[in-house]
């Protein structure tokens, strides 16, 4: 069925929870899945060997889009990840009371697309605490779109 990588940056644990749910759904579909915290990865060659790459990142800041701090080094070096031609999906948690609700999701998707990734146009933007049912449903949609 293929191999997937799920990389997340999480401060409060919400994005990590969603990443774990997404990884489980992908595994249940028969994919081999690697789940990694953004603090534990380097961008260079990150996507090599994967059919699907899923990024999860929370958004901080009111006046401008701020990616979760652990994710910033990966984002800055994303050009070295080898995303060209790979299927990529993006999710994140945020607070809809902020001007740029889940802006990190859009920023990551746009950067991945500019690097030649085949971004699955189904971003998941979660307001506040994660809804695991919503995360499961999204992961299933990503699987269908990636097929």
Curated annotation (Swiss-Prot):
Matching SUPFAM superfamilies: Flavoproteins
Keywords noted in UniProt: Electron transport, Flavoprotein, FMN, Transport
Pfam families membership: Flavodoxin_1
The UniProt record lists the keyword DNA repair: no
Entry-linked Gene3D superfamilies: 3.40.50.360
GO molecular function, one term: FMN binding
Origin superkingdom: Bacteria
Function, as annotated: Low-potential electron donor to a number of redox enzymes.
Domain Flavodoxin-like: 4-143
Cofactor: FMN
UniProt-recorded name of the protein: Flavodoxin
Lineage: Bacteria, Pseudomonadati, Thermodesulfobacteriota, Desulfovibrionia, Desulfovibrionales
Organism, scientific name: Megalodesulfovibrio gigas (Desulfovibrio gigas)
Family of the protein in this entry: Belongs to the flavodoxin family.
